[in-house]
A protein has these predicted regions:
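Active-site helix of classical SDR
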Residues: 36, 72, 80
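Active-site loop-to-helix junction immediately N-terminal to the catalytic Tyr of the SDR YXXXK motif
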Residues: 62-70, 82, 110
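Residue(s) in the substrate-gating loop at a strand-loop-helix junction
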Residues: 56
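A glycine/serine/threonine-rich, flexible loop-to-helix segment
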Residues: 10, 89, 101-128, 170-172
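Short C-terminal tail/terminal secondary-structure segment
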Residues: 61, 131, 145, 151-172
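Catalytic Tyr-X3-Lys loop
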Residues: 6-33, 52, 76, 131
Length: 172
């Protein structure tokens, strides 16, 4: 389904418009815009709240073959920074978490062969990740708990917490 395609054997010129729309609908409209419009008025009225949006390392460094996804995630970062400035005076904090590479069902086919051995892409990712491994769900949860805690992060807004094993510290 081109609307949910995150990767593919397309050059930039070949990426279907539906893939662009699908990525922006899923990641920006469905993942940030609509939830913020639905839930943030109550936070703004109460004078307190924390919005945590999910970006991607590919928002910072657009990766080959996933440019529609990269652009949508870069838009998540941009909108989150705007909302952080817009809502800070009302007491609502807006931050992002940028995950590195976490094995998930949606990317298993590009990371591992059917026999479970790593693909060339996995070996490349690990070679560019100083910690030399994939992330684990608990590591993302820890960042989210920190950002959600008023006590721990009441002065944190407009920030991007990178949970990427150092991936973005490397030059690709």
């Amino acid at each position: 389904d081109p609307k949910t395609t995150l990767t593919g054997d397309f050059t930039f010129e070949q990426i279907p418009v539906d893939a662009w729309r699908g990525n922006f609908d899923l990641n920006l409209v469905g993942g940030v815009l609509l939830p913020c419009q639905e839930f943030c008025p109550a936070m703004l009225q109460s004078g307190r709240g924390s919005v945590i949006n999910i970006a991607s390392v590919s928002a910072h460094i657009p990766l080959s073959r996933v440019i529609a996804y990269s652009a949508a995630k870069a838009a998540v970062l941009s909108l989150s920074q705007f909302l952080a400035r817009e809502w800070a005076a009302a007491g609502v904090r807006v931050n992002t978490i940028t995950p590195g590479f976490f094995p998930a069902e949606q990317n298993r086919k590009i990371l591992f062969h059917e026999d479970g051995s790593p693909t060339a892409r996995t070996e490349s990712i690990m070679g560019h990740t100083p910690m030399g491994r994939f992330g684990e769900a608990d590591e993302l949860i820890g960042a989210a708990v920190f950002l959600a805690s008023h006590q721990a992060s009441s002065f944190v807004t407009g920030s991007d917490i990178r949970v990427d094993g150092g991936f973005l510290s490397q030059t690709i």
